[in-house]
């Protein structure tokens, strides 16, 4: 299975003590896990929306994600983005999140961005979209 390949790679790279694979985490425990991270790295090539990015931002964690899908919409302009499969770019972006002034801005603006995605706001926007479709507004 792929998880075994990842664990083998981490061991060969000497990262087995720095990378943790978590499974079956209850939703209520996610904020504490996010808040224990230095940076949330999400180089996914395809996602339906990117809810984990919003969870990280809401937890005050800087985000580094891939370009080319919905992740930029989820993460907003104060997250960092790299091309998929750009290993050097990913490493550089992760390192940038440790720069104190950039990190502070990413955290502050990320928290503000995440507030735009409340359940109430999403429901309002969805209903407005349906209204426009049903009344044929464009």
List each language-model region with its residue ranges.
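Carbohydrate transferase catalytic cores enriched for Leloir-type hexosyltransferases
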Residues: 1-138
């Amino acid at each position: 299975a792929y998880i075994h390949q990842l664990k083998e790679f981490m061991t060969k790279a000497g990262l087995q003590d720095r990378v943790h694979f978590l499974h079956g985490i209850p939703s209520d425990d996610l904020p504490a896990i996010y808040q224990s991270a230095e940076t949330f790295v999400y180089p996914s090539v395809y996602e339906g929306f990117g809810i984990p990015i919003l969870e990280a931002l809401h937890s005050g964690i800087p985000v580094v994600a891939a370009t080319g899908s919905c992740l930029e919409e989820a993460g907003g302009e104060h997250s960092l983005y790299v091309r998929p499969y750009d290993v050097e770019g990913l490493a550089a972006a992760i390192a940038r999140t440790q720069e104190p002034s950039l990190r502070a801005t990413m955290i502050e603006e990320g928290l503000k961005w995440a507030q735009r995605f409340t359940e109430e706001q999403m429901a309002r926007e969805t209903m407005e979209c349906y209204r426009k479709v049903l009344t044929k507004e464009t």
